[in-house]
Amino acid sequence: MENNTEDINEVESIETVTTGYEPREPQKEIHKAIKDNRWVTAICHRRMGKTVCAINQLIHSALNCTKESPQLAYIAPTYSQAKRIAWGYLKDYTRPLGGIANESELRVDFLGRRISLYGADSPDALRGIYLDGCVIDEYGDVHPSLFTEVLRPALSDRLGWALFIGTPKGSNHFKELRDFADNPSNEG
């Protein structure tokens, strides 16, 4: 992904001022990709900071969403993984924004916005909601029907975005999605 200095500075200033998050180069590439595309795949090495990046992208998108009552979601393969991996980051990074954490529902409300954590092991919890954006972490460990049957409809009416993020785990539906995204004939 090529980076335009102006775009990088935009991302840095918004993220740094509101949450204290300072993205590293690979994280900046992900933020720029989401700014420029509705669907984004990101294959990340271990310890790259993908969860911190993902949580801060959700916060940034919530803050900049002009629709009424924005709702965004972070989805891990299991509910317990979402809590263990991302819950602390979500609470910490929204605290400066007056975030109110609901421990039993794993959600934070701030400034009329909501970010919730879910597990792909309980897809019914995502049915019937609308989303302005979502992150599907470790997409290779999630059944692909979660996106096609549950998340895409939740994103459709508000033209929400999705970030498919994870670490490489051989040939699976995440690799197929990335290969599809990398093929220039699939643009548009």
Protein language model annotation of sequence segments:
Residues 2-188:
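Phosphate/NTP-binding elements of NTP-utilizing enzymes
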